């Protein structure tokens, strides 16, 4: 079928067969082709000399937009978006920062915020930078104990909270050093105010602090590039959370490197980005600050992920960050809809093939016959105006990536990064249609791979642990030199714990994890050792191996039952058979799975840390069968390979 309108292909910024430079030497260090000095081991720190801190980048954005719209919000899912201009935002932010100074907060103090995404988040952040304050974000999945630890470790005297519920959560375990709670909404109860006073904590509203700052001015104290702008706490491992210390230079370098690589597709005045991913994480923070720097606008979601489509239809964003969990849901919904209609599936497959052919020729448009017949509904569910999507936080399956590029008819780039690298390490090139890699290094860093002999990955084979050095790499974990030394070596390389490989075209592909910790598709970290240690408390379990994939949202386990306990239970319940027979019995599986989940709940495992399915295996892991080390530790890669059919089968049957 003929296309509606011919469209010119987008310009490829570099040669696709050679996407990164290799720095001279024998370490095979890869760097960006977008910054001419990268091949000499130098990295970008800024794009404009007058915009080297987040205080300055915001003001440059105000100039670029000519005081255009900056922050958008709506009060309900049925109302329209209303907007605050850059100048209005700057004034309110400065007044709020000044109000904090009136309360006794001083330059370089650490101030917390515990809130969902909303305009006040940005007003606080920019107000903090007016007086060189350090932003520390708290969030739900940290939990009360971790939040209390953070407040105590940072000597935090002031926390901005969204509402009465979050205020009380902070008060539940508030350290003695906490002096002030500032609530964004006016819904705080008098009982909460009394409770706070009994703990020596004063309560204020966001508006009160802003009004105070408008009446009593203080000269601004802008930060230097080397000053800390934020401490981003990550709960990715066992024990207390780690505070990733990031400077203004770190964040500006990271966002400028991404803007540089986006080239013709970078944000500009007139663009609108939907803010819905947590601002507590650096992916969203970098995206938003890059938008502001470009003079573009940010519209905030209403806060309920179930209403995301309503927000998208109302805002009609042109730019959107995304995570695999969201895109997987869109893909799975479509596949489910198509399963009952062979004719619709045929039409869809024909449309996808035609769009993919254009995609491979860098033709990206929304006006083909296939857009009108097949993909218009999906495009409109994202607002209809999307031109750029940035995917991060976890890997996206190749078939889902290709589908989204064809269906949304917009540029979709996929990045790889870590909080310790201020988010981006690498990013795919605009127009590269090949999925399942994460592109070349961005211009603020270089990347090398180092041997992981215990997993049989060697740099000489272009495989190994991903190590990063550059202006985006953090200075260390806050007040934690021991854990800092574990990940930053004496030469300044950050060891990510991820295992990657270089593809022939100079792009990076993440293939494994050196540490046992891994991420699920929704971005949550899993520590299998911790979960296994809880499950093995079950009387029915001799050994267990917890497994997950970064493209999946749940975990599964291989379980070796305790033969004596299980046979005793089977005898009492009149279930005959050998251990092998019992392992395949439905009631036995239900018994052990339910007991595991019960132990998990008793020991505080979160829902995403609980297994969704198990496979019972009669033979123990041992040194002799190659599944245990001489120190009787699990040989994870070997167990994964040994039980690959069973693991694949469990994931096939998960919802």
Regions found by a protein language model. Name each.
Residues 2-26, 103, 126, 130-211, ...:
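Structural core segment of the AMP-binding/adenylate-forming
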Residues 46-50, 67, 71-126, 143-148, ...:
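Conserved AMP-binding/adenylate-forming core of the ANL superfamily
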Residues 66-69, 183, 202-204, 211-233, ...:
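Conserved pre-ATP/AMP-binding loop-to-beta segment of ANL
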Residues 78, 165-225, 334-377:
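ANL superfamily adenylate-forming
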Residues 83-87, 229-255:
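Conserved AMP-binding A3 loop
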Residues 201-206, 318-321, 330-433, 446, ...:
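Gly/Ser/Thr-rich phosphate-binding loop
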Residues 252-275, 279-372, 385, 407:
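Conserved AMP-binding/adenylation subdomain of ANL enzymes
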Residues 455-461, 465-520:
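Conserved ATP-binding/catalytic segment of the ANL
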